[in-house]
Amino acid sequence: MTTTSRAEQRSNLFRFIQAVFNPLSKTILRSPLHGVMSRKLLLITFTGRKSGKELTTPISYVRQGDTLLLAVGGSWWKNLRGGATVWLRLQGKQRTAVTEVVTDEEAMSEVYQIILAQNPTQGRFMGIKASPDGKPNTNDLRQAIERGTAVVKVHLKAGVAIQ
């Protein structure tokens, strides 16, 4: 009998969620029923760095004024490096934005403190718990970084909404 590590379990869960939840989320977030999900989820559309194809994925976010904070895993976020322009379906409206990828541990810790305070589920999904002082657990954060987790700051372009 083989045992499965927590990292493998998390990876398997992530793949399951992508396969089942993502298509359903895309449909709902594009529909008039988006309100049931759009307070915490958005659709982000970007261009693949290798394929050149337009790709769309649902993702959880925390809003800080005109900046959205995304905790991201996997490798798709690498498409967002270098100030990529992205298109969002945010609370039923199309918006354009520019990305800023954060991979530095100290900067990620600051952002995760905000994420954990506003949406603890997002942190748990990435395997990062809050310490008693509200900051992310240092070991959890380091392990997440080793797994390829990053933070993406999505800066909304002022006055640019696409209907």
Regions found by a protein language model. Give the residues of each.
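Short hydrophobic/aromatic-rich motifs at helix boundaries and adjacent loops
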Residues: M1-T2, F14-I17, T47-R49, G83-A84
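Alpha-helical membrane-targeting segments
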Residues: T3-L41, T121-G134, R142-G148
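Short, structured beta-strand-loop surface elements
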Residues: A7-E8, G74-I162
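Short beta-strand segments
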Residues: R39-G73
